[in-house]
């Protein structure tokens, strides 16, 4: 079983070393800079407009794919969302549906090298950590997403996940009925700017007030979520 406290260490620590890792090495003198790596991570610039009702995981993946394709990507995209076991189907862990990395944003900055670093699976991985900040967690157009201090604040990201990227197993609803409801339930949220809340986690900070668009806005979000290229 993964250690949640190690994942929490990675979630709460952002150092200059991570920023250095995200930079491309300078080209030799007299040579043009190499092109940035293709985008493989972004925050969705728009959700479903129906709160946490995304049409299930498949609907959320379609949103990621549509936005990425419009931005010129030819990769296959999945939403970073967990789902609870239901109707005879096993739980789905967000961490298991996003490929293996590395992941780069629309400006070529590396967000994480692999799944272990993204979540801080081990002490070593937690020390390396990820580069998830307001500066790097941008949308597919390369635009910054509003965070704490901006109006309106939109830093809440739908994840339905624990710190280690797995689905909750306590029997409570953390996914607004597996992303099909805009009425009953709650959704677990992360903060893309890693500001506010107890653990300043990018993927598991606090639950929403509800599942409607109005509830998500009132909590400090807009029904947005993370998208990762799986190839």
Regions found by a protein language model. Give the residues of each.
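Bacterial N-terminal signal peptides
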Residues: 8-18
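Secreted/extracellular ectodomain signature
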Residues: 20-231
């Amino acid at each position: 079983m993964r250690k949640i406290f190690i994942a929490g260490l990675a979630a709460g620590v952002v150092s200059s070393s991570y920023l250095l890792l995200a930079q491309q090495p300078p080209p030799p003198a007299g040579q043009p800079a190499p092109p940035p790596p293709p985008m493989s991570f972004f925050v969705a610039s728009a959700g479903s407009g129906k709160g946490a009702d995304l049409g299930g995981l498949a609907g959320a993946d379609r949103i990621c794919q549509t936005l990425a394709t419009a931005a010129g990507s030819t990769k296959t995209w999945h939403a970073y969302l967990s789902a609870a076991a239901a109707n005879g189907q096993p739980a789905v862990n967000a961490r298991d549906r996003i490929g293996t990395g590395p992941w780069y944003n629309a400006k070529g900055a590396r967000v994480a090298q692999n799944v272990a670093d993204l979540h801080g699976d081990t002490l070593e991985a937690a020390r390396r950590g990820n580069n998830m900040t307001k500066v790097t967690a941008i949308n597919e157009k390369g635009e910054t997403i509003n965070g704490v201090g901006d109006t309106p604040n939109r830093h809440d990201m739908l994840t339905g996940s624990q710190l280690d990227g797995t689905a909750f197993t306590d029997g409570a609803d953390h996914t607004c009925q597996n992303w099909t409801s805009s009425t009953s339930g709650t959704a677990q949220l992360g903060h893309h700017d890693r500001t506010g809340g107890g653990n300043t986690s990018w993927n598991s900070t606090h639950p929403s007030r509800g599942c409607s668009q109005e509830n998500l806005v009132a909590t400090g979000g807009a029904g947005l979520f993370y998208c990762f290229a799986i190839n």
